[in-house]
């Protein structure tokens, strides 16, 4: 009888704590049993202007933790953004863009208890980008020759992102807005073209420089997707 009394008193002494634990237990149990969105396919159309076309897959591991991975292709970079260390690609006929694969993977933690992957979150991600192009050299009169120089930019990022993902109220379509800083390791083989006027006849000259450094980049974007 005394043991039963102690149990009853302990239950009434911590009503708030018991309620929180039971709520989290119910959410965790429902995540494993209820038919809800646990997979998401997403696109990031605005990254096209930065020379990347990726597709993302997010898989909910628990009601708060998920894994997001993406694979894509790098093409022409249209934007020169100083805060990301990018250079815009030349639109001239002598620039040949060479597509390369890009990939990223990371873990996402949602700050709220929800059966489905939505709400405010924090995410840490590793990303690899490679932009490659061949620059055709010009002859004495400015005509393009068959000789080329390879321009190559390789970026390895560790990104710390914060965002908000929301499923539609009447459908499984969603949006995901995010932003945050990244530590970027860069290895660049950069081709620079200029007209040399020091000789008797003007001619095109080329400098190829290799650099390896680290910088801080910043990201802000919007993904759209579908959950199932």
Task: Label every model-predicted segment.
Residues 59-173:
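Gram-negative (and chloroplast) outer-membrane scaffold detector with strong preference
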Residues 52-54, 102, 159, 219:
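Transmembrane beta-barrel architecture of outer membranes
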Residues 1-33:
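Cleavable N-terminal export/targeting peptides
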């Amino acid at each position: 009888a005394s043991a039963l009394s102690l149990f009853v008193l302990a239950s009434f002494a911590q009503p708030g704590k018991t309620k929180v634990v039971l709520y989290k237990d119910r959410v965790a149990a429902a995540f494993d049993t209820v038919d809800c969105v646990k997979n998401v396919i997403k696109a990031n159309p605005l990254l096209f202007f930065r020379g990347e076309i990726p597709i993302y897959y997010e898989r909910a591991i628990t009601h708060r933790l998920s894994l997001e991975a993406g694979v894509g292709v790098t093409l022409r970079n249209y934007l020169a953004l100083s805060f990301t260390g990018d250079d815009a690609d030349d639109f001239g006929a002598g620039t040949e863009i060479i597509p390369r694969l890009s990939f990223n993977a990371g873990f996402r933690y949602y700050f709220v208890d929800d059966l489905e992957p939505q709400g405010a979150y924090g995410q840490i991600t590793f990303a690899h980008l490679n932009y490659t192009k061949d620059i055709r050299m010009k002859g004495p009169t400015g005509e393009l020759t068959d000789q080329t120089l390879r321009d190559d930019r390789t970026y390895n990022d560790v990104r710390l992102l914060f965002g908000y993902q929301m499923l539609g109220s009447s459908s499984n379509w969603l949006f995901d807005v995010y932003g945050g800083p990244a530590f970027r390791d860069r290895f660049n083989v950069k081709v620079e073209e200029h007209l040399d006027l020091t000789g008797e006849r003007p001619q095109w000259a080329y400098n190829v420089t290799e650099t390896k450094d680290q910088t801080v980049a910043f990201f802000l974007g919007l993904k759209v997707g579908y959950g199932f």
